[in-house]
């Protein structure tokens, strides 16, 4: 967070304000909340790190030796409130449950249900005791479907808002403060502005503190800034940016070693962490792409239903029906258009995919996020722990004037090696192992060295593991060469020195040193080459400088190593004084350089390459140093070999950056300080203009601004991260992806998905599954909607031609919630038709889940053939029973007259009302069976949208089971005794099953020919009109 940018003083806490201003300028709550959120997005104004100690003391009215008085502290606590984070307003569980019951598709089904109850009510009031109860049953079933599906969805997604709870777990419980000159342990809630606080290794920092004294203090800022290495702290202001200066320690970060004393400059919500917490909890998430698609689908279905309903309402009035009958028809047509089983089908399909993804280490917290990942067009990825292994590892060595590469892979299996027989390596390894404060935690002997946990900072731990693996057990080395004196590393000296007794001469001592390479070289007057000592010369200094620049340019942390065999007068028992040096610290012998980096994960380069093939832009957004960020970006392929930054081109051509042509720049590394001064238009221009982008040294607010910039340009954005600093961006993203192992609780709560193995490569798997489920949902919806036409047309012809009802309401329910359900769900198991990772991400504005082409295919083509099959069977059965098709026209009023028991058929036979109804229900059963038979073909053709079935094959076992299940269920509904009473379904003659079979074959042949033409003439008329 950079100073110098004027913001409202919302982050400024006053230790001694005299009164609280009343809020006379009252604004509407929503506007005020939006304004507060915009303030939180801005960088914090802070100048405490620049103040002298006297100015600091005066600003906070505190004695820097004795601290605040107990009375003053109590006054400030009363005025400013406790040092806690304000919990956000949480959504009650009952509201979440209601959203599942009444949101999206459920609303359509509730409308259908209410219309059914209305129709039944009208029937009851008109027909009294003879009222048809079909609409009552349909209304009850629709309500039950919504409630059961809603409960299922709520159960799948049930998660309380625990974002602030996870922040609370990060807050330390006790703090050591100095008040009235006395040290006292107090509850962290009671820490106030201006308090003098002491922090030691192992403590969590209780507030934002300006350091006034420190001894070897290092803090782990990784959760805030993304820096993977502990940062040293001292009283001096070392940077304009308060996040980068060394004299401030932040609330909830960990002090890993040393001690520090300082003055509290911010508490609770006003701390950097508090602002992130407020920002995260204040953000609202937009609709997921799949929610938008379902809303679009509802609009289409509603429009079709209302259009048909209103059209036939007026048509029925024209044909002479009463207005009461016309209203009943209107309601019936609208309800018939509602695909009752689709809500359950979509929910189950998403759930199945979520479970499949969980087996591949992608834990989805929100079902709709399953598809969102497939729609992703931009991934904003954190570096530390996501693209990298989150462990410092030795990457290169430089000794004997040669750079050697070490094995940085997670499995240590690349076989990279270096000359371990060199005497120089013998010295270098001993210095790295002995002049080292890191150690292995006990009882880990059975674990591989790379998997063992250590005590000590990241760089020393990396050296410890490397020496243990490449040289010899460090513990044995330390036993044989006991340490007798030490000067720990500090930011002023920039070196660490230790003195040891020699293994082969127990009376002599050796002085070992490591640290910043330029400092180490200053101590040296000689150097080792192939184990021999030579005087330091200009050639060696030039070689050293070149190696240092090369390794530093790779974004690696470079350390220099040297030693000195102390003269014989420093024999065993000599009392070394490290305060007032009584031993030589010059004329040391330079041994070499070792560089370390947090290396990329093995699978990441391949994953980034797959993302690029899939048309997904991968942007690195990190708090780490630009050189390190750029090096990792190049090693994983975020910046590809073919593309160069302006700096790369300038260096290659030996020209200034201003002379580089903008057309030749394809990649860019943007520093947080540059981003701070950009407006949204400039940021948008960078996001549009460059293919490969790295943002380095970014603050949490800037990460959020980058995500919002991508979304402004129409991208579906996925954000990956593991730290607290990532949580605002994770929540704002279309899909937030947190790390399961290294991720903080806060990031996991803010995210929609968790990578259980912390592997960026798992995201590619998730994208593939997301794209596949979108394709398969299209197929499921196409299959489900097709049967709507043979369900609606009987009702329409019943009105227009006044024939006996060909298909009843109960039978429609048996299709939608019975025979169609398992086959529709089985399409979720369908394998992709082609490499779905080779195509561009779908355009949410044009590539809809349900489009006019899908509706045209389902309703206008396949659905019509299915309706013909049903009517053919219907008319065959009635003809066999004596009623020829032409004689059925206009017969409905007589057919449904309960008092007419001598209705004559075509041949003069008389039929009672009961006999007519048995034939009618038999026809309805046959119509139902016909739909099942033509749905066989529909299911098979829905397996693919472009490929031939003969290429795709019938390997989907769940789909084969679905075919068998719907056939057996249809047979059971027809032939089980009692169904004539329960569902008005009657047994059929076997030959009536075959009436629809030719239509089923016709559907299959028609669709295979259509797909063949589409494949032969890509982009042609047929593809434009029918490829959904």
UniProtKB/Swiss-Prot annotation:
In its UniProt record, a GO molecular function of this protein is: P-type sodium:potassium-exchanging transporter activity
Specify the species: Rattus norvegicus (Rat)
Indicate the family of this protein.
Belongs to the cation transport ATPase (P-type) (TC 3.A.3) family. Type IIC subfamily.
Q: What is this protein called?
A: Sodium/potassium-transporting ATPase subunit alpha-4
Could you give a single Gene Ontology term from the biological process aspect? intracellular potassium ion homeostasis
Q: Which InterPro entries match?
A: ATPase_P-typ_cation-transptr_C, ATPase_P-typ_cation-transptr_N, ATPase_P-typ_cyto_dom_N, ATPase_P-typ_P_site, ATPase_P-typ_TM_dom_sf, ATPase_P-typ_transduc_dom_A_sf, Cation_transp_ATPase_P-type, HAD-like_sf
What residues bear Phosphoserine in this entry? 948
The residues listed in the UniProt record as binding Mg(2+), with positions renumbered to this chain, are 722, 726
> Which segments cross the bilayer?
93-113, 138-158, 295-314, 327-344, 778-797, 808-828, 849-871, 924-943, 957-975, 991-1011
Q: Where is this region: Interaction with phosphoinositide-3 kinase?
A: 87-89
**Entry GO terms, CC:** cell projection; photoreceptor cell cilium; plasma membrane; rod photoreceptor outer segment; sodium:potassium-exchanging ATPase complex; sperm midpiece
Q: Which domain of life is it from?
A: Eukaryota
Q: Where is the active site?
A: 382
**So what does this thing catalyse?**
K(+)(out) + Na(+)(in) + ATP + H2O = K(+)(in) + Na(+)(out) + ADP + phosphate + H(+)
Cite the ranges annotated as topological domain Cytoplasmic: 1-92, 159-294, 345-777, 829-848, 944-956, 1012-1028
The protein's predominant localisation is: membrane
Localization: Cell membrane
Name of the gene this protein is made from: Atp1a4
- Give the way it sits in the membrane: Multi-pass membrane protein
Functional note = This is the catalytic component of the active enzyme, which catalyzes the hydrolysis of ATP coupled with the exchange of sodium and potassium ions across the plasma membrane. This action creates the electrochemical gradient of sodium and potassium ions, providing the energy for active transport of various nutrients. Plays a role in sperm motility.
EC no. given is 7.2.2.13
Enzyme class label: translocase
The uppermost taxa in this organism's lineage are: Eukaryota, Metazoa, Chordata, Craniata, Vertebrata
């Amino acid at each position: 967070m950079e100073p110098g940018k004027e913001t409202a003083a919302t982050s400024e806490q006053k230790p001694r304000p005299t009164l609280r201003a009343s809020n006379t300028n009252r604004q509407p709550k929503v506007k005020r909340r939006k304004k507060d959120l915009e303030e939180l997005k801005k960088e914090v104004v802070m100048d405490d790190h620049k103040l002298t100690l006297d100015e600091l003391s005066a600003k906070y009215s505190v004695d820097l030796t004795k601290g605040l008085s107990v009375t003053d502290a109590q006054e400030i606590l009363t005025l400013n409130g406790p040092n806690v984070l304000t919990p956000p307003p949480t959504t009650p569980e009952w509201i979440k449950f209601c959203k599942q019951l009444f949101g999206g598709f459920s609303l359509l089904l509730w409308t259908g249900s209410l219309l059914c109850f209305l129709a039944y009510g009208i029937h009851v009031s008109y027909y009294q005791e003879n009222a048809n109860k079909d609409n009552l049953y349909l209304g009850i079933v629709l309500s039950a479907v919504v409630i059961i599906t809603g409960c299922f969805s709520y159960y799948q997604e049930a998660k309380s808002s625990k974002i602030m709870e996870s922040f609370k777990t990060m807050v330390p419980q006790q703090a050591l403060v100095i008040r009235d000159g006395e040290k006292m342990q107090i509850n962290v809630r009671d820490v106030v502005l201006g308090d003098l606080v002491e922090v030691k290794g192992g403590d969590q920092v209780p507030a934002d503190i300006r350091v006034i004294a420190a001894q070897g203090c290092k803090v782990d800022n990784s959760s805030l800034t993304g820096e993977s290495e502990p940062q040293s702290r001292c009283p001096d202001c070392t940077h304009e940016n308060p996040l980068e200066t060394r004299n401030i320690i932040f609330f909830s970060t960990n002090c890993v070693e040393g001690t520090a004393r300082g003055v509290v400059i911010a508490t609770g919500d006003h701390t950097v962490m508090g602002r992130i917490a407020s920002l995260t909890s204040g953000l609202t998430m937009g609709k997921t792409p799949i929610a938008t698609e379902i809303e679009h689908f509802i609009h289409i279905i509603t429009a079709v239903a209302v259009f048909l309903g209103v059209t036939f309402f007026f048509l029925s009035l024209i044909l002479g029906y009463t207005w009461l009958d016309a209203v009943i028809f209107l309601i019936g047509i609208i309800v018939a258009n509602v695909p009752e089983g689709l809500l359950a089908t979509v929910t189950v399909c998403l759930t199945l995919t979520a479970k499949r993804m969980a087996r591949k280490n992608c834990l989805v917290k929100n079902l709709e996020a399953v598809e969102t990942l497939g729609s992703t067009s931009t991934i904003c990825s954190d570096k530390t722990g996501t693209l990298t292994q989150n462990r410092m590892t030795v990457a290169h060595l430089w000794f004997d004037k040669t750079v050697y590469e070490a094995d940085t892979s997670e499995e240590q299996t690349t076989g990279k090696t270096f000359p371990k027989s060199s005497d120089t390596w013998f010295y270098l390894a001993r210095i790295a192992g002995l002049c080292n404060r890191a150690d292995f935690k006990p009882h880990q002997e059975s674990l591989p060295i790379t998997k063992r946990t250590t005590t000590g900072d990241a760089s020393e731990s990396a050296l410890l593991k490397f020496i243990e693996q490449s040289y010899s057990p460090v513990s044995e080395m330390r036993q044989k060469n006991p340490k007798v004196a030490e000067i720990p590393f500090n930011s002023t000296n920039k070196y660490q020195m230790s003195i040891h007794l020699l293994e082969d001469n127990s009376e002599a001592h050796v002085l070992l040193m490591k640290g910043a390479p330029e400092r180490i070289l200053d101590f040296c007057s000689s150097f080792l080459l192939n184990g021999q000592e030579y005087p330091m010369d200009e050639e060696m200094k030039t070689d050293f400088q070149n190696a240092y620049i090369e390794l530093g340019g790779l974004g690696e942390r470079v350390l220099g190593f040297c030693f000195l065999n102390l003269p014989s007068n420093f024999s065993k028992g000599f009392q070394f004084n490290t305060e007032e040096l009584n031993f030589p610290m010059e004329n040391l012998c330079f041994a070499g350089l070792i560089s370390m980096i947090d290396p990329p994960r093995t699978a990441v380069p391949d994953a980034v390459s797959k993302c690029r093939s899939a048309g997904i832009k991968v942007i690195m957004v990190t708090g780490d140093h630009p050189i390190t960020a750029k090096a990792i970006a190049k090693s994983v392929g975020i910046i590809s070999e073919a593309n160069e930054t302006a700096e790369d081109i300038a260096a290659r051509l030996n020209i200034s950056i201003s002379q580089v042509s903008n057309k030749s720049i394809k990649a860019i590394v943007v520093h947080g300080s540059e981003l701070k001064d950009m407006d949204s238009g400039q940021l948008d221009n960078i996001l549009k203009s460059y293919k490969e982008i790295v943002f380095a040294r970014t603050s949490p607010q800037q990460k959020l601004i980058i995500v919002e910039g991508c979304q402004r340009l129409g991208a579906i954005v996925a954000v990956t991260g593991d730290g607290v600093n990532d949580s605002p961006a994770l929540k704002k993203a279309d899909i937030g992806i947190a790390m399961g192992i290294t991720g903080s609780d806060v990031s996991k709560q803010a995210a929609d998905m968790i990578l259980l193995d912390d592997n960026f490569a798992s995201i590619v798997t998730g994208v593939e599954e997301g794209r596949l489920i979108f394709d398969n949902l299209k197929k499921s919806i196409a299959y489900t909607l097709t049967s709507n036409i043979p369900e609606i047309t009987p009702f329409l012809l019943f009105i227009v031609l006044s024939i006996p009802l060909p298909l009843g309401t109960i039978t429609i329910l048996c299709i939608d919630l019975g025979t169609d359900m398992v086959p529709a769900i089985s399409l979720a198991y369908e394998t992709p038709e082609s490499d779905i990772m080779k195509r561009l991400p779908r355009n949410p504005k044009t590539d809809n889940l349900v489009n006019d082409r899908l509706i045209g295919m389902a309703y206008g083509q396949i659905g019509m053939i299915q309706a013909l099959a049903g009517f053919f069977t219907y008319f065959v059965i009635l003809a066999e029973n004596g009623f020829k098709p032409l004689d059925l026209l206009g017969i409905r009023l007589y057919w449904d007259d309960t008092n007419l028991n001598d209705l004559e058929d075509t041949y003069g036979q008389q039929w009672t009302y009961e006999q007519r109804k048995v034939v009618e229900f038999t026809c309805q059963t046959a119509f139902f069976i016909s739909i099942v038979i033509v749905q066989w073909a529909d299911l098979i053709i829905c397996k693919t949208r472009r490929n031939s079935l003969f290429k795709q094959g019938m390997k989907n076992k769940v789909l084969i089971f679905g075919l068998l299940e719907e056939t057996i269920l249809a047979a059971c509904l027809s032939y089980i005794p009692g169904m004539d009473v329960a569902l008005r379904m009657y047994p059929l003659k076997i030959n009536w099953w075959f009436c629809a079979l030719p239509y089923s074959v016709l559907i299959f042949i028609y669709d295979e020919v259509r797909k063949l033409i589409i494949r032969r003439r890509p982009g042609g008329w047929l593809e434009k009109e029918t490829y959904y």
